[in-house]
Regions:
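Alpha-helical transmembrane segments of multi-pass inner-membrane proteins
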Residues: 2-5, 9, 21-29, 34-45, ...
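Loop-to-helix entry and N-terminal half of a specific, functionally important transmembrane alpha helix
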Residues: 260-266, 403-407, 435-467
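Membrane helix-loop boundary segments at the extracytoplasmic
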Residues: 83-94, 409-416, 448-489
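Transmembrane signal-anchor hairpin modules in multi-pass inner-membrane enzymes, especially those
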Residues: 1-144, 155, 179-189, 245-259, ...
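Membrane-interface micro-motifs in multi-pass membrane enzymes
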Residues: 52-56, 96-105, 158-162, 223-237, ...
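Membrane-interface helix caps and helix-loop-helix hairpins in membrane proteins
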Residues: 50, 93-96, 148-158, 273-274, ...
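Hydrophobic alpha-helical transmembrane segments
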Residues: 418-430
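Long extracytoplasmic/lumenal interhelical loops at the membrane interface
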Residues: 214-216, 221, 345-360, 368, ...
Length: 514
């Protein structure tokens, strides 16, 4: 006890000495001194790093500024992420690849969100009870369960963690932010602006190579790995930007804003066409089909029944469809008509044949472990053993080290079993249904159409997800979950037609009484 008392006295004595010293100076003097000391340390550190060629440490001030910005502007950080993501570049540090600067910021926001939710309680609890949120949580819970049955638990838990730092900052954080609809405008504007910068750079690269078709696959590097992810991102943004063009005047946009929106849309369409992404082209056609059906005032139940009937028809006609596809020998090319025709070539087109190879591996993995799957994130490491010689393409590797399933639906099927497929698909279906419901029920015409066009943007990825898999990357996760948050926020916070009608009736009664 005497030792503790002595320590307390020593601490108090030290405090009094420091206080008496600093009391001699004004607050401004102390501030200037601290700022000057920090500047001196940064300069000294910079000189040291330059002398010894530790150039990476020159980013420390930028990192510190980013951390300070995220902490001070926590609620608006998602808009900052939207601005940075298209311009982010993948960098490898030893065996770890990370997208700089977007992913470090996402991780920081993820940690700060957990702190704010669990230690301060500053978050609206009703968000967690919204149908889309419930579907997301169920999917994450099943992912957690399958982590314990995984072939490699460490890999699976890393995969789950990476999904959390996409979903929480890009879905749960912006839902509350989007109560202010101007923040939705800012999100779409920031992401589209950065994406258009990438498109301009990619188009310039493409032009410098004489618009050679083979270079179309790589002209967007280092910002996007290949043309498919690039095309998918553009397809996601075209419907929301088109909304601002169609309803800009009603939103009160002046000439300057309208010119800005038109410029964005023209650049997006140019990049979309020059991406030569067949899956993206098909997905945008599907989104337009949704718009036609919804504007035709067809009931939601009818749409769902039609979808189910189409699935049944395709299932029973699968043999004939595949037979027709096998007769197509048109390979992908720079000619638009030929490139579109090559979509159904499953006999000689290397990309399509390799996609079928990956799908066959995923189905075989599911058959082996139908309940829990091989574990989240494990497909990449295991699919090589399931390859059949007759399924291989000219771009296949014997070791099977080229990556993903090329499907947002077969990935959870192979990694998390049948329940994984159902919970993952449920997120898409529930969001689509809620988006159409929000369009039908929202009192504000502008917000109703915003919900519809956001749903159309998401539809492009639901369709694209049959052929590719990109939600494990920040490039697609940020706009995808951001638009999902737009749909949820409008459904959650916008005034419904029924409530608006009640308010109007009350006003009429009050006026009649007067």
């Amino acid at each position: 006890m005497k030792a503790f008392d002595l320590a307390d006295k020593l601490i108090e004595k030290t405090k009094s000495v420091f206080n008496s010293f600093f009391d001699r100076f004004s607050d401004n003097t102390i501030t200037y001194f601290c700022v000057g000391l920090c500047c001196a340390l940064f300069i000294a550190g910079g000189v040291y790093c330059l002398n010894y060629e530790y150039y990476i440490y020159a980013l420390i001030p930028v990192v510190l500024f980013g951390i300070l910005f995220v902490i001070k502007q926590f609620k608006n950080t998602f808009l900052f992420i939207a601005l940075l993501t298209p311009l982010a570049v993948n960098m490898s540090f030893k065996e770890v690849a990370i997208s700089i600067p977007s992913e470090p910021i996402l991780i920081l926001v993820f940690l700060l969100f957990l702190w704010e939710r669990f230690f301060t309680g500053r978050y609206e609890g009703k968000v967690f009870s919204h149908p889309i949120s419930v579907a997301v949580i169920i999917n994450l819970v099943w992912t957690l369960i399958t982590c314990f049955t995984s072939e490699d638990m460490l890999v699976s838990f890393k995969y789950l963690l990476s999904q959390l730092w996409f979903i929480i900052p890009c879905f749960y954080l912006p839902i509350v932010l989007f109560k202010n609809t101007r923040k939705i405008d800012a999100f779409v504007g920031f992401y589209s602006l950065s994406l258009c910068i990438v498109i301009c750079i990619a188009t310039a690269n493409f032009a410098s190579h004489g618009f050679a078709f083979n270079f179309a696959h790589y002209s967007m590097q280092p910002f996007y790995n290949d043309h498919t992810a690039y095309g998918a991102a553009i397809a996601l943004l075209i419907p929301p930007v088109a909304y601002y063009l169609i309803y800009g005047k009603e939103l009160g946009f002046g000439k300057g804003k309208m010119i800005f929106v038109i410029t964005l849309l023209v650049i997006l369409i140019t990049g979309f066409v020059l991406s030569y992404s067949r899956a993206a082209w098909v997905s945008l056609c599907a989104a337009f089909g949704v718009w036609v059906l919804v504007k035709s005032n067809i009931k939601l139940k009818t749409l769902i029944y039609c979808g189910l009937v189409m699935c049944v028809v395709v299932a029973f006609s699968w043999g004939r469809i595949m037979g027709a596809f096998e007769k197509n020998d048109q390979d992908s090319s720079g000619n638009m008509a030929e490139h579109i025709s090559s979509i159904t070539n499953i006999s000689t087109d290397a990309s399509n044949v390799e996609r079928l190879n990956r799908w066959a591996c995923a189905l075989d993995m599911f058959k082996e472990r139908p309940v829990f799957g091989c574990g989240p994130g494990m497909y990449t490491f295991l699919y090589g053993a399931y390859q059949k010689s007759y399924n291989l393409s000219i771009i296949s590797t014997d070791s099977g080290d080229l990556g993903s399933t090329h499907s947002e639906y077969l990935r959870p099927l192979s990694e998390q079993g049948l329940i994984g497929l159902l919970t993952n698909t449920a997120v898409f279906v529930v969001t689509f249904v809620i988006g159409i419901r929000a369009y039908r029920r929202t009192a504000s015409k502008l917000l109703a159409n915003l919900a519809l066009f956001a749903t159309m943007g998401l539809t492009t990825y639901y369709v694209h997800g049959f052929l590719n898999q990109f939600l494990e990357t920040d490039k697609l996760a940020v706009p995808f979950w951001g638009l999902t948050a737009v749909v949820a926020a409008i459904d959650l916070y916008a005034t419904k037609k029924e409530k608006q009608a009640e308010k109007d009736n009350e006003k009429q009664l009050l006026n009649s009484e007067k």
